[in-house]
Structures are given as structure tokens and as C-alpha cells.
Design a protein with these regions (language model features):
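Carbohydrate-interacting regions of secretory-pathway proteins
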Residues: 27-283
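Bacterial N-terminal signal peptides
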Residues: 14-26
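Bacterial N-terminal signal peptides that target proteins for export
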Residues: 2-16
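Short stretches within intrinsically disordered, low-complexity N-terminal or propeptide regions
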Residues: 4, 18-20, 30, 42
Length: 283
């Protein structure tokens, strides 16, 4: 089993984001995970600052450490509509340096609220063993998510065919969204499986939040505004029990052990914005 990580998984250099300043303490050293050492940033959360600094950019230190931008701040290059070669028009746009989902109004939905006519935005590339950081905000009562370890083949074979099948980092207006009744459905959760812990602090609808996912081997973590709020390990009794009670229980058996896949921005037919999407592959 991978060891518990003890550092914030944010890229190098000072970042004024999501109501907190990330200040670099070190940009090299052991990760605390099994399987050898790796370069990594170590940061400290300081006083609140503007969320608008250095969006969609890599610092020199980040670039040197191997971080990559998955969104250039101007185009949807590197992304396509799930199940399509490109992106059907009118659903996803770039607006003011952010990827925005354009709300179309309530249509037919699945029991979990997933629109039957929506189209998720999926990365062209797939990833294994990574740290992913991004900023996001939702409109009032908004609901969305970022999915990872997604199989496009499995996704298009199941209904709805343009909605991703993968682990979901929940993004939600915890105060007013309809799907706020269960702790495992609130912001920061591994959706329908693990609720965020007591360290969680969330900015309200319309304000930027900063999130990160760490996924290596069997080990996964969700971070929200500088705090680790979810931690899990594939194949453990705790994980298998949560999986068996979740909406994923009807998926193929191999889904529960999947360790690689695409990154997906969810179309939940609400207005949601993503920016500063950065990934570091652990090699």
C-alpha cells in the first residue's frame, strides 16, 4: 500500500489562488510515496489573496519540474467531446481565460442527475500516476465535477454515451445545489464513495476554489483549498465496501482497479468554469 502523503500537491513558485497564497518551501525531495523518490513542490498556505494571479501559466520552476498545462487559456486544444472527434458546438466555450460549460436548461436526466443529452469534455491524452491541480467555480446551485481514470470506450458503451465513466472529484455549490443532501455528494468528495473530512473549507458559488488530485498506483487523494480532504487506496476493504454501495457497483469488475485514463470535465448542465489546469506525471 502506498504511504500517506504529507505535503500539499501544488506546483512550484508562489501562487495566489482560491483565497490563499501557496508559498514554496522546497521544490525537490522525496514524495513520501513508495516506488522511489520524485521531484515535488512543498508549499505552505498563507494569508488570503486575489484568485486572479497568474492564471493558466506555468512558472519557470513548474516547467523545470515537469508540470504541463492542459489548458492554454485561449482554446480547447487538447480536448474533445467524449465520443466525438472534436467538440459539438454550443456546449463548451473559452470565456475570460476559463473553460466554461454553457447551461442549456433542464432536459431529461438519469436518477443521479446526469443529463442524457450532455457531452463531457475529455482530454485527448490519458494519464497514469499523476498530480493534477486546477481552479474552478460554479454558478449558484451549480453542480459539476472533474473525472479521472476515465475509459472513453467504456463511457460510450454505457448510457448516456457522452458522459464519462470514471472517478469523480465533486464540484458543487454545497449551500444551494439540489444534490447536497449526502456528504459523499458534496464538494471535494470522491463522488458517491468518500465524503470530505472536517478540514474542508469551500468558497461560495461564484468564487474560485483550488483543487488537486494525487493518484499513484493504488493510492488517491483529493485536496481542496490547501487541505487534503479525501484519501483512499484501491483494493482495500474500506474501498471495496464503499464501491459496493455506490452507483459504480453495476460497472464492470475491472473498473474498481483501473489506474489510468483520461481527465474529464463534466457536463451536468450547469454553468461551471475551469482554469489553470496543470498536471505533473510521476515518472
Amino acid at each position: 500500500m502506498a504511504q500517506t502523503r504529507s505535503r500539499n500537491p501544488w506546483p512550484c513558485e508562489s501562487l495566489a489562488i482560491a483565497g490563499c497564497t501557496m508559498i514554496v518551501a522546497s521544490c525537490a525531495g522525496s514524495s513520501g510515496s513508495t516506488g522511489g523518490s520524485m521531484r515535488a513542490s512543498s508549499v505552505t498556505v498563507s494569508e488570503p489573496m486575489s484568485a486572479d494571479a497568474a492564471a493558466n501559466q506555468l512558472t519557470a520552476a513548474e516547467a523545470a519540474a515537469g508540470w504541463q498545462l492542459l489548458f492554454d487559456g485561449k482554446t480547447l486544444n487538447g480536448w474533445h467531446g467524449l465520443g466525438f472527434k472534436d467538440m459539438p458546438p454550443g456546449l463548451w466555450v473559452v470565456e475570460d481565460g476559463a473553460i466554461k460549460h454553457v447551461r442549456k436548461g433542464q432536459g431529461p436526466v438519469q436518477p443521479d442527475g446526469q443529463p442524457l443529452t450532455g457531452v463531457d469534455l475529455i482530454s485527448d491524452r490519458s494519464f497514469a500516476d499523476f498530480e493534477l491541480a486546477w481552479e474552478w467555480k460554479v454558478a449558484e446551485a451549480g453542480n459539476s465535477g472533474l473525472k479521472y481514470n476515465v475509459s472513453e470506450e467504456l463511457s460510450t458503451a454505457m448510457s448516456p454515451p457522452h458522459a464519462a465513466k470514471g472517478w469523480e472529484y465533486q464540484m458543487l455549490d454545497d449551500e444551494k445545489a439540489e444534490d447536497n443532501k449526502l456528504a459523499t455528494h458534496r464538494a471535494g468528495a470522491l463522488y458517491d464513495m468518500f465524503a470530505p473530512n472536517e478540514k474542508k473549507r469551500i468558497n461560495p458559488a461564484g468564487e474560485w476554489n483550488r483543487s488537486a488530485i494525487v493518484f499513484r498506483g493504488n493510492h488517491g487523494e483529493h485536496w481542496l483549498n490547501g487541505e487534503k480532504v479525501v484519501e483512499f487506496d484501491l483494493g482495500t476493504a474500506r474501498f471495496d465496501s464503499a464501491f459496493a454501495k455506490s452507483k459504480y457497483r453495476t460497472y464492470p469488475a475491472w473498473f474498481a482497479t483501473r489506474r489510468a485514463g483520461h481527465i474529464v470535465l463534466q457536463d451536468h448542465d450547469d454553468s461551471v468554469w475551469f482554469r489553470s489546469i496543470k498536471i505533473w506525471e510521476m515518472r
